[in-house]
């Protein structure tokens, strides 16, 4: 490790023309484990920020299993509008239709005072009827888990979105360290005709919070995938 103190010159930086000017990236790690720290949530750096995260929209994806192979429906998207402060609501009044098993995807973004940059969420939680089902939290991770960071996102939507797109469910290979709360991998179960209350909360790493609440209603007809006799199942 290189020891430095305030006022030391640690290097000189140029500009290739694409970075808007010379700048420095840095990170703090635990020496023994090489675990990366979130320096803002840990209180090491305190930026000026009283702006709660922005919840842009949500998506619902129904899931099923065919002959042991997991399948899913296309995402159903719902617009969101801010009602007051950090409180949000859906633009529709009627409940969101839900199948027997499914999960939600949340598109959100965050800003800080005085800068035009956008930032990711620190924490996202989902509960159904007051019972916590899912929580994602980014306090840091070990270097070996860097390749798993995109596992928390819903990548098909993340590719074209300018926001952070977080899957409120755990993929099979996604590290458990990202999820301090996880019930049934985040799957929301809904019986036909059953009404449930969903609450989604989003925090930034300065402690600002936004929330969205809405009802879901169990459909009588659910997503059912059928096996394709002409298809070949490939496994890694």
Tell me what each language-model feature is.
Residues 1-13:
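Short, well-structured beta-strand-loop connectors
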């Amino acid at each position: 490790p290189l020891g430095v103190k305030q006022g030391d010159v640690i290097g000189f930086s140029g500009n290739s023309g694409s970075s808007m000017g010379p700048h420095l990236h840095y990170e703090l790690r635990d020496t023994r484990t090489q675990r990366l720290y979130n320096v803002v949530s840990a209180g090491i750096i305190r930026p000026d920020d009283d702006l709660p995260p922005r919840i842009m929209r949500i998506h619902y994806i129904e899931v099923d299993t065919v002959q042991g192979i997991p399948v899913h429906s296309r995402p159903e998207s719902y617009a969101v509008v801010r009602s007051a402060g950090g409180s949000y609501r859906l633009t529709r009044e009627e409940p969101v239709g839900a199948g027997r098993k499914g999960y939600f995807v949340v598109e959100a973004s965050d800003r800080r005072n005085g800068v035009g940059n956008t930032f990711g969420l620190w924490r996202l939680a989902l509960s159904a009827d007051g019972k916590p089902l899912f929580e994602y939290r980014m306090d840091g991770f070990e270097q070996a888990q860097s390749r798993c960071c995109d596992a928390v996102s819903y990548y098909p939507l993340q590719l074209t979105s300018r926001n952070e797109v977080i899957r409120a469910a755990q993929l099979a290979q996604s590290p458990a360290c990202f999820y301090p709360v996880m019930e049934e991998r985040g799957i929301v179960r809904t019986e036909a005709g059953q009404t449930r209350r969903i609450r989604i909360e989003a925090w930034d790493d300065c402690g600002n919070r936004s929330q969205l609440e809405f009802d879901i209603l169990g459909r009588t007809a659910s997503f059912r995938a059928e096996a394709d006799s002409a298809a070949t199942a490939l496994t890694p």
